[in-house]
């Protein structure tokens, strides 16, 4: 009997502990609900709108309410309502502050400071940004106000901020990129590649606040500058869609490379850092990039982009903004492989003075020097170009038909020889007799030796 009583008391003690835990949980929920209620009241005052009444929220929490009384109407959370109303209120506030009846507008801060006559453009640039702006009744008033403000913060001979790419270093463009990953770089997807392609081919002036503009004079590419978002820059780099990147020492941080490079491959990022410390210092420098486009199959990346990167000091002369509206096709991929190989093979032939700063399977970084290239640099160039000339390495994953089409394009180079090549040996003459001794003395040549000799034919790195 005593044993049974002891067991029941233990059960009672356990139940008491569970009840106490539930009380603590309930008190925590009540406390959180009170905080939410205060948040609702605060937001109602800020937005000037009527949100879901507190009594309705309380009733919705009661288990006695049946599902049939709710109907099919969707009940939005206070956060959803606030987000919608706040966005609307923000635009209405801008319209009310400046208005659309003015004839000219001035933006005093940020990369887009200047005079505008289209209110919609002004609103797109100042919305959700801490920029000062004002509307004027005449263009003359706007010009006078802009001139006075400009004289206060700049020297007379300084170039206007909106006319130089350095302006983007002063603006946190990352806030304008929504939906991009905040973690480290990850493998590019096919959907992301086509999104980037569309961002170039359908670029508008309003898109410039993302930190790039199109450079489609030779291929579909983009030029990125100092304040570009690191994740967007990394995505375009993996897409093989960059022709130039302009970088400079971070403002206020001596020796620190631009944050735009933070999501690039670590080897390339380290090379940029070393180049800045050794050569560029506080000057603006560039990365001139020649790349192949990646190849996908059912969302999976078969062949990543391969890059040749040349680093140099900027002369403040930038590529022309040129848009070409075209869709991606595999002939563009084939041309990108051909162009990359044509650029690489110049190092050691027509370009004598260069130095290889970094080499990986996907990237070769070089800079031009006065002296002739060292033998080690020439060897690295030959190693890097080998999988292009033979369509091996990363290009071994190309679909059969695409590899064959790429092979046909590469036939113009004597150094090209791949498994898709058709080798036509000369027919033996009927009168040609080879003795057994001569046959035995003939050395067999392996396929590797054929590839090597074909690669070196007509392309000597002197």
UniProtKB/Swiss-Prot annotation:
The record's keywords, sorted A to Z, are:
Host cytoplasm, Translation regulation
Q: Where in the cell is it found?
A: Host cytoplasm
* Span list, region Disordered: 433-462
Which one GO biological process term can you cite for this protein? regulation of translation
Signal sequence, start to end = none
**Residue spans with biased composition (Polar residues)?**
443-462
One Pfam family matching this protein: Cauli_VI
Write out the GO cellular component annotations.
host cell cytoplasm
The family database entries (InterPro entries) matched by this protein are listed as: Ribosomal_bL9/RNase_H1_N, RNase_H1_N
Q: What does this protein do?
A: Enhances the translation of downstream ORFs on polycistronic mRNAs derived from soybean chlorotic mottle virus.
Remaining remarks: The inclusion bodies are the site of viral DNA synthesis, virion assembly and accumulation in the infected cell.
Query: What family is it from?
Result: Belongs to the caulimoviridae viroplasmin family.
Q: What is this protein called?
A: Transactivator/viroplasmin protein
Protein source organism: Soybean chlorotic mottle virus
């Amino acid at each position: 009997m005593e044993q049974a009583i002891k067991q029941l008391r233990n059960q009672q003690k356990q139940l008491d502990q569970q009840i106490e835990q539930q009380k603590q949980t309930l008190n925590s929920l009540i406390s959180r609900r009170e905080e939410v209620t205060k948040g609702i009241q605060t937001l109602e005052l800020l937005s000037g709108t009527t949100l879901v009444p507190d009594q309705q929220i309380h009733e919705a929490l009661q288990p006695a309410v049946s599902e049939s009384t709710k109907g099919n109407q969707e009940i939005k959370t206070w956060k959803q309502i606030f987000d919608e109303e706040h966005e609307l209120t923000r635009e209405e506030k801008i319209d009310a502050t400046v208005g659309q009846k003015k004839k000219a507008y001035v933006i005093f801060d940020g990369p887009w400071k200047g005079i505008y006559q289209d209110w919609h453009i002004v609103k797109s640039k100042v919305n959700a940004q801490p920029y000062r702006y004002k509307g004027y009744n005449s263009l003359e008033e706007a010009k006078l106000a802009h001139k006075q403000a400009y004289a206060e913060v700049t020297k007379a001979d300084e170039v206007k901020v909106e006319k130089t790419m350095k302006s983007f270093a002063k603006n946190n463009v990352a806030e304008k990129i929504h939906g991009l990953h905040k973690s480290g770089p990850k493998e590019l997807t096919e959907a992301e590649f086509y999104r980037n392609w569309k961002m170039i081919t359908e670029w508008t002036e309003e898109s410039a606040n993302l930190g790039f503009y199109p450079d489609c004079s030779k291929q579909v590419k983009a030029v990125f500058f100092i304040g570009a978002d690191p994740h967007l820059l990394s995505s375009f780099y993996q897409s093989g869609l960059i022709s130039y990147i302009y970088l400079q020492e971070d403002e206020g941080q001596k020796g620190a490379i631009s944050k735009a490079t933070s999501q690039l491959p670590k080897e390339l990022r380290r090379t940029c850092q070393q180049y800045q410390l050794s050569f560029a210092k506080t000057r603006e420098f560039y990365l001139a990039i020649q790349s192949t486009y990646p190849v996908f199959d059912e969302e999976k990346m078969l062949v990543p982009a391969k890059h040749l990167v040349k680093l140099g000091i900027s002369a403040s002369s930038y590529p022309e903004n040129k848009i070409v509206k075209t869709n991606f096709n595999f002939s563009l991929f084939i041309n990108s492989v051909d162009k990359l190989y044509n650029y690489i093979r110049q190092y050691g032939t027509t370009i004598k003075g260069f130095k290889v700063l970094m080499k990986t399977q996907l990237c070769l970084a070089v800079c031009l020097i006065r002296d002739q290239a060292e033998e080690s640099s020439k060897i690295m160039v030959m190693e890097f170009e080998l999988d292009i000339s033979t369509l091996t390495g990363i290009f071994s994953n190309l679909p059969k038909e695409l590899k064959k089409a790429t092979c046909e394009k590469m036939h113009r180079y004597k150094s090209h020889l791949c498994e898709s090549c058709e080798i036509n040996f000369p027919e033996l003459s009927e009168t040609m007799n080879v003795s057994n001794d001569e046959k035995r003395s003939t050395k067999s040549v392996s396929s590797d030796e054929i590839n090597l000799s074909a690669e070196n034919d007509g392309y000597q790195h002197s």
